């Protein structure tokens, strides 16, 4: 089924009465950084003010009275007051004596039995510190925990809870909030936080663009795909706000797409275009499900090798000749074949055979397979796609590409032409 994210229109503004009815409470981005600053009323004071201490009032009053008496009878306090009076007496009209001064507990002045009560936390090192002395990250966790206890019904909205928090603390915070069973609305730039939610509970927003949210129930019952989706969102949250995604099989494909784009005058990242390494063709169908029409509905172009053509078509329940209609492009037979053809054997082979990456005996053994000193294009492509040398060969190839040769890598240019059309 479909669901949508509300747009901002004056007629849709929610009233204070409606917010109160649904139990709405909101935490802004600076909330946690200010609520435990020393020298001001803190969220701990607010939390304590909600306690019912009626049964403990007599004991607390007695303790405060005892403290006041102890201060009054203390020689140290008495001496301090004498010295202070001597300093003040010449400066204040009418004069000041020791009997005019008195040290008292804050609770007796404020008529508040809980005045100036502090929260202390023992650290892993065994040192006990006040909440106001903790790191900004720990302050944020304490603040949000207390806020959640004080607002334990309805919805809670939090703006950028990742502020000041270590990535692992971000994850732990969200898991703790989810365990409360409350409805959460969170604005975040953190992939670690976003990945804690199922994809259909995530709305991607971007200035001057419609909000994007997958169809309700997307990936329901598909735990393997959910795991992959959370991993992609965790590590590449910027994909959710991309203007276009180019999905490639692996690292070397990404390197070549970026280099060809650069040499042919197309700025991928300026225009919000992101490249996603799938980790193999078998994951392409999951990428299409997550980021395509039924998912976040982000313009998506896919590049795969020829040997994956039939497999992907079968998974998408279409014929291979229909792949282009789904924005899937094919490198024939693969990008190694294409960049060898574009660069020419002589230049690339000379660079590879003199590269320190290869030991002399490796080059010798390779050429012995073909009984000649210089391989033909097919043989050189075989070396370049070898898993032990694939990355290094791609790096060398990228370094030798020119605008002219880059324009001859057919499948990559087809992808870029589509993206920039």
Where are these regions (language model features)?
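Extended helical coiled-coil dimerization/tether regions that scaffold
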Residues: 51-139, 146, 150, 155
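Activity-critical C-terminal alpha-helical subdomain
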Residues: 305-385
């Amino acid at each position: 089924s479909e669901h949508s994210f509300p747009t901002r229109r004056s007629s849709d503004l929610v009233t204070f009465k409606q917010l109160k009815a649904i139990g709405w409470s909101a935490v802004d981005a600076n909330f946690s950084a200010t609520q435990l600053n020393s020298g001001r009323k803190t969220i701990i004071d607010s939390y304590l003010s909600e306690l019912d201490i009626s049964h403990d009032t007599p004991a607390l009053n007695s303790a405060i009275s005892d403290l006041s008496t102890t201060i009054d009878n203390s020689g140290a306090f008495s001496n301090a007051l004498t010295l202070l009076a001597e300093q003040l007496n010449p400066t204040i009209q009418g004069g000041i004596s020791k009997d005019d001064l008195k040290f008292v507990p804050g609770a007796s002045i404020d008529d508040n039995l809980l005045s100036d009560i502090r929260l202390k936390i023992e650290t892993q090192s065994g040192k006990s510190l006040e909440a106001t002395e903790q790191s900004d990250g720990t302050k944020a966790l304490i603040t949000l925990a207390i806020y959640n206890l004080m607002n334990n019904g309805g919805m809670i909205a939090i703006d950028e809870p990742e502020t000041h928090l270590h990535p692992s603390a971000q994850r732990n915070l969200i898991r703790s909030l989810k365990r409360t069973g409350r409805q959460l609305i969170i604005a975040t730039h953190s992939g670690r936080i976003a990945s804690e939610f199922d994809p259909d509970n995530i709305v991607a927003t971007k200035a001057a663009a419609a909000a994007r949210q997958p169809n309700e129930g997307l990936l329901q019952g598909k735990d393997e795909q959910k795991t992959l989706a959370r991993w992609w969102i965790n590590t590449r949250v910027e994909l959710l706000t991309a203007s276009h995604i180019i999905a490639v099989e692996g690292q070397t494909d990404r390197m070549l797409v970026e280099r060809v784009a650069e040499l042919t005058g197309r700025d991928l990242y300026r225009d919000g275009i992101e490249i996603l390494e799938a980790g193999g063709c078998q994951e392409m169908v999951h990428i299409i499900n997550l980021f395509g029409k039924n998912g976040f509905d982000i313009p998506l172009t896919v590049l795969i090798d020829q040997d994956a053509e039939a497999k992907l078509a079968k998974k998408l329940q279409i014929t291979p000749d229909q792949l282009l209609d789904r924005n899937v492009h094919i490198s024939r037979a693969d990008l190694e074949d294409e960049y060898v053809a574009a660069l020419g054997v002589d230049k690339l082979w000379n660079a590879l055979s003199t590269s320190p990456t290869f030991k002399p005996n490796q080059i010798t053994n390779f050429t012995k397979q073909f009984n000649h000193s210089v391989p033909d294009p097919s043989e050189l492509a075989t070396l370049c796609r070898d898993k032990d040398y694939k990355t290094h060969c791609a790096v060398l190839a990228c370094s030798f590409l020119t605008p002219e040769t880059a324009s001859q890598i057919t499948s990559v240019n087809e992808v870029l032409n589509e993206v920039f059309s």
